[in-house]
Design a protein with these regions (language model features):
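Helix-loop-strand module that forms the ligand-binding subsite of alpha/beta enzymes
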Residues: 68-152
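Short histidine/acidic/glycine/proline-rich micro-motifs that form metal-
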Residues: 10-12, 139-142, 173-176
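Glycine-rich phosphate/pyrophosphate-binding loop and the adjoining helix
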Residues: 144-194
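N-terminal beta1-alpha1-beta2 submodule of the flavodoxin-like/Rossmannoid cofactor-binding fold
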Residues: 1-90, 95-103, 188-194
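Active-site donor-binding loop signature of nucleotide-sugar glycosyltransferases
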Residues: 40, 137, 171-173
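Residues at the starts of beta-strands that form the adenosine-phosphate
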Residues: 2, 34, 130-132, 164-165
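Glycine-rich, flexible loop/turn motifs
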Residues: 46, 122-123, 165
Length: 194
């Protein structure tokens, strides 16, 4: 089995979302599992300079920026396709996702690769039979409240890609009671049944 772990916190050291994702990975992985790791703060590029064709630019028409963007996009799509389980850790920044996580979703959303359009115009996700775990942290935002624009968006994106089995581990409102939030998150991880 392949487990794809994606960390998006801008903090390398002292990140609660990264630490919880690591604990989750230790809980679910088996010795024979292959781990694919991606730190979105290491080489993420942002979608820019595209025309109305979106992510469908012929290779001969790509400039250097496009080539770098498509190279990373192809790698991200490959990582998603190859994985059986996906762990995404993300803090809520200003009520939404980290910019690098949004960039990841933009680069991973590829027609014919992660989704397609049906004849009736509706979308269909192509990444079936996968499970995702979201590890969401926040300072003051209550998870799934009307101020949380990360969790529902990320669930929607994964569903858009065809990933319908999504479980959330949360350590929210840490600024109000850090110890309680961490204890609850650890309990959520401990309850996971494989």
């Amino acid at each position: 089995m392949k487990i794809y772990q994606i960390d998006s916190s801008a903090r390398k050291e002292g990140s609660t979302s990264r630490a919880l994702a690591k604990k989750l990975l230790e809980k679910i992985k088996k010795p024979e599992d292959e781990i694919i790791y991606r730190d979105l703060n290491e080489e993420m590029v942002f979608v820019s300079g595209l025309t109305e064709s979106g992510m469908n630019i012929d290779e001969k028409d790509q400039n250097e920026n496009h080539k770098k963007m498509f190279e990373l996009s192809n790698q991200l799509v490959k990582e998603l396709k190859e994985s059986d389980i996906i762990i995404i850790s993300a803090p809520i920044y200003n009520y939404g996702p980290p910019a690098t996580l949004k960039a990841w979703s933009d680069l991973a959303a590829r027609i014919g690769e992660t989704f397609k359009f049906k004849p009736n115009g509706r979308r269909e996700g192509l990444l079936k039979n996968k499970k995702a775990y979201l590890v969401i942290t926040s300072g003051g935002t209550k998870l799934n409240s009307n101020e949380d624009f990360l969790t529902p968006w990320l669930k929607f994106i994964l569903n858009f890609f065809g990933i319908e089995k999504v479980e959330t581990i949360s350590a929210d409102q840490m600024a109000l009671d850090y110890e309680k939030s961490i204890k609850e998150a650890h309990a959520q991880i401990d309850k996971i049944k494989l």
